[in-house]
């Protein structure tokens, strides 16, 4: 009796179909898996960090996972429900480049003011380095988080105001594929750094 139904209700399925790039069958399969891993229907930051650590066994992914979690948790209640999870997964795995860049921008914009400051960029880049630097050799001009942040700002901050707008971020990323790799937050693509 206390067991949650492992099928999505028709109205929820329709909402997710309209807001993701997944088929009905895929949505039902993801939902079953989500409930198996999160029987409460909600994922906490600690649970999320444990899952994320599996993708990066040789580094410390906890800080980066916190930033990803915050970006997934669109209603700010401190948990990720299935809707938040599947919409973010759709954007990051099947979204168009512009959607992915907007999502990444929202992750880097820590205070939500619509701009990425040098400090915000540095915090995320430091988290990435903690996660992957033990298994990756960085080029000399990106050998520290500070150098990588400087490189990103040099290329993207076109008006030199010390912060990146969404427009600068998207334009800069689109004009330089290596920047897309620098900003990449998809665990399966870290080898492309």
Curated annotation (Swiss-Prot):
Alphabetical list of InterPro entries matching this protein: EF-hand-dom_pair (IPR011992), EF_Hand_1_Ca_BS (IPR018247), EF_hand_dom (IPR002048), Recoverin (IPR028846)
Binding site for Ca(2+) 3: 157, 159, 161, 163, 168
Family: Belongs to the recoverin family.
Species this chain originates from: Xenopus laevis (African clawed frog)
Disulfide bonds: none
Alphabetical keyword list: Calcium, Lipoprotein, Metal-binding, Myristate, Repeat
Entry's Gene Ontology molecular function annotations: calcium ion binding
Any one GO BP annotation for this protein: regulation of signal transduction
Record protein name field: Hippocalcin-like protein 1
Superkingdom of origin organism: Eukaryota
Gene: hpcal1
Residues noted as binding Ca(2+) 1 in the record, renumbered to the chain: 73, 75, 77, 79, 84
SMART domains documented for this protein: EFh
Stored CDD domains: EFh
Lipidation (N-myristoyl glycine): 2
């Amino acid at each position: 009796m206390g067991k949650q139904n492992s099928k999505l209700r028709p109205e929820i399925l329709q909402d997710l179909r309209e807001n993701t790039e997944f088929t009905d069958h895929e949505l039902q399969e993801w939902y079953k898996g989500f409930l198996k891993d999160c029987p409460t229907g909600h994922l906490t930051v600690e649970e999320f960090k444990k899952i994320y650590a599996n993708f990066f066994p040789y580094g410390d992914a906890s800080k980066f996972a916190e930033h990803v979690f915050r970006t997934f948790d669109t209603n700010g209640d401190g948990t990720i429900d299935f809707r938040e999870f599947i919409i973010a997964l759709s954007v990051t795995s099947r979204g168009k480049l512009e959607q992915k860049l907007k999502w990444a921008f929202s992750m880097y914009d820590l205070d939500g003011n619509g701009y990425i400051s040098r400090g915000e960029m540095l915090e995320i880049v430091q988290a990435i380095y903690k996660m992957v630097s033990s298994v990756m050799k960085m080029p000399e001009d990106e050998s520290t988080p500070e150098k990588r942040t400087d490189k990103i700002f040099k290329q993207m901050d076109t008006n030199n105001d010390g912060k990146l707008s969404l427009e600068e971020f998207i334009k800069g990323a689109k004009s330089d594929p290596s920047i897309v790799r620098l900003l990449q937050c998809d665990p399966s693509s870290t080898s492309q750094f």
